[in-house]
């Protein structure tokens, strides 16, 4: 069973990161309602806002309210206020790498490119 099953609203903690942005773009394009938060303004945040995504700066516990699923960056500390609030509310929380795998399963074929 996919962690996306039955989910409509997905909140991304650390949405300004280069690892989160492609996942956000794909899920937004697939019709999911996306919200996000980060600590700093930046080009990615501006682009997400231009896509119609609600982005909260800085992190705020109430930003996760209404989400069906929370995705967090590896850069997010375990005591992050949004992550803690999501757990209090019983909202499923997954790390970005798990969501990347889920997104790959949405397509019949995937290609991975890596390097240093």
Regions found by a protein language model. Give the residues of each.
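N-terminal leader/targeting and accessory segments in enzymes
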Residues: 1-99
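Walker A (P-loop) phosphate-binding motif
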Residues: 12, 97, 101-116
């Amino acid at each position: 069973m996919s962690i996306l099953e039955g989910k409509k609203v997905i909140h991304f903690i650390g949405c300004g990161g280069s690892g989160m942005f492609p996942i956000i773009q794909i899920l937004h394009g697939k019709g999911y309602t996306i919200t996000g938060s980060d600590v700093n303004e930046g080009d990615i945040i501006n682009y997400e806002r231009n896509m119609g995504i609600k982005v909260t700066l800085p992190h705020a516990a109430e930003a996760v309210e209404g989400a069906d699923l929370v995705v967090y960056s590896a850069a997010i500390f375990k005591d992050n206020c949004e992550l803690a609030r999501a757990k209090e509310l019983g909202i499923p929380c997954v790390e970005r790498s798990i969501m990347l795998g889920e997104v790959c399963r949405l397509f019949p074929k995937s290609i991975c490119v890596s390097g240093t």
